[in-house]
Amino acid sequence: MDVNTERSVFYISDGTAITAEVLGHAVMSQFPVATHGVTLPFVETVQRAQAVKAQINALYQQSGLRPLVFISIVTPVIRDIILQSDGFCQDIVQSLVGPLQQELGLLPAPVANRTHGLTAGNLSKYDARIAAIDYTLAHDDGISLRGLEDAQVILLGVSRCGKTPTSLYLAMQFGIRAANYPFIADDMDNLKLPAALKPFQHKLFGLTIEPERLAAIRQERAENTRYASLRQCRLEVGEVEALFRTQQIRYLNSTNYSVEEIATKILDIMSLTRRMY
């Protein structure tokens, strides 16, 4: 098969389809093939399932290539309709349920939307995640330095090095209360750790970035300005990294990492307990 030939990939669920997407993407990332993804959540009725089956079959007829179909469907009748399509179907949950049933000696009690839905059993975890998101938004970009005793991590770094997206990902994905504080150009003449942060040194974590990458990012926001110049970026990165070393603040170069990787590395380095939702 030509790796440049685009394959259609379906992620189908009678719930949010998050499980199908995550596991499907993980599997597809192992293959050097171009894909076009179609995510179909809440396929909960026979009529909808029949329409999805027809969509898969039509694509197969048009392209001559079987669409790749990852499903996470609890309802048997809905699942069977999709499995009868012309797609190459992978039931990513049921393939694990059988062996686990044998090991546990228990029959599964499947319930739609249990994984990512709101139930009595996970309500407290959901509330904790919303509280973490609220906290992170209120402590983004140095907006407030109050309540830092409640932070689980405080990210530091120059402007546009990835502090805000990483903080939000930590809050939304793991329920981590993350504050972040920026060092700006005006700080560089006499860069030091703000007094409000010193009592929480054990919570501080630095993000840095290659100056060339930083300049490219800033050029998109403020083209041909001192703020976006390579010289200014080199100055700021150098000064901030020196501060991290002087203050013995652990830090990570974010240049070649995704937000997901940065957040996970922070959890590991800071020994923070992850809470999956």
UniProtKB/Swiss-Prot annotation:
Alphabetically ordered keywords of this record: Kinase, Nucleotide-binding, Serine/threonine-protein kinase, Transferase
Name of the protein: Putative phosphoenolpyruvate synthase regulatory protein
Signal sequence region: none
Function description: Bifunctional serine/threonine kinase and phosphorylase involved in the regulation of the phosphoenolpyruvate synthase (PEPS) by catalyzing its phosphorylation/dephosphorylation.
Gene Ontology MF, one: phosphotransferase activity, phosphate group as acceptor
Record's keyword annotation contains Phosphoprotein: no
Entry binding sites for ADP: 157-164
Record flagged with keyword Phosphoprotein: no
Catalyzed reactions per annotation: [pyruvate, water dikinase] + ADP = [pyruvate, water dikinase]-phosphate + AMP + H(+); [pyruvate, water dikinase]-phosphate + phosphate + H(+) = [pyruvate, water dikinase] + diphosphate
UniProt superkingdom: Bacteria
Pfam families: Kinase-PPPase (PF03618)
Family membership noted in the UniProt record: Belongs to the pyruvate, phosphate/water dikinase regulatory protein family. PSRP subfamily.
PANTHER family linked to this entry: PYRUVATE, PHOSPHATE DIKINASE REGULATORY PROTEIN 1, CHLOROPLASTIC (PTHR31756:SF3)
Lineage, highest ranks first: Bacteria, Pseudomonadati, Pseudomonadota, Gammaproteobacteria, Enterobacterales
Enzyme Commission number: 2.7.11.33, 2.7.4.28
Source organism: Erwinia tasmaniensis (strain DSM 17950 / CFBP 7177 / CIP 109463 / NCPPB 4357 / Et1/99)
